[in-house]
């Protein structure tokens, strides 16, 4: 560490790296469930006026199956196709100002729209963390369908004998074991806007 940063800073970076890994693992396990959900819960194609009825039906089906409020989640780019379905000719000035100031609507036909934070994959600014083509239709207030399990405690091993490494540095290794699973009896929907 050469006294360039404190041990507390190192631990904070380790925690941030583990957190990023867990978030990416959860997202990847959820995104791979799409095709296994069945045609009632997984749709593909552009969201336009022609597919509006199918989109509305998917939202309704998730709400009925979960007996709860539903939200539509996606990145700003993914939600843009839903924004385009909102007609503002009849809207109040407050709604028009919301679109003008934020570039988006907070609701689509009474359904809350939730923007997922986007980011780049580690060391690659050409790959996004979250697909810009995927919308998630998720129930609110039900038990989470994604389960995260840690096995045991996170362990840290240190080599603090300056003679062990040729350059006389110390080394540390952090180990944690976890698993992620998606329970598919909780109904949710996915819409892939890739054409």
Residue ranges and their predicted role:
Residues 1-65:
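Alpha-helical scaffold segments that mediate packing/assembly in large oligomeric complexes
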Residues 88-195:
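Sequence/fold signature of self-assembling virion shell proteins
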Residues 33, 79-80, 120, 181:
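A broad, structure-centric signal for solvent-exposed, well-ordered loop/edge residues
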Residues 42-95:
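Extended amphipathic alpha-helical segments with heptad-repeat/coiled-coil character used for oligomerization
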Residues 20, 24, 78-80, 178:
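Short loop/turn segments at secondary-structure transitions that flank enzyme active sites
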Residues 6, 29, 66-68, 80-81, ...:
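Generic serine detector
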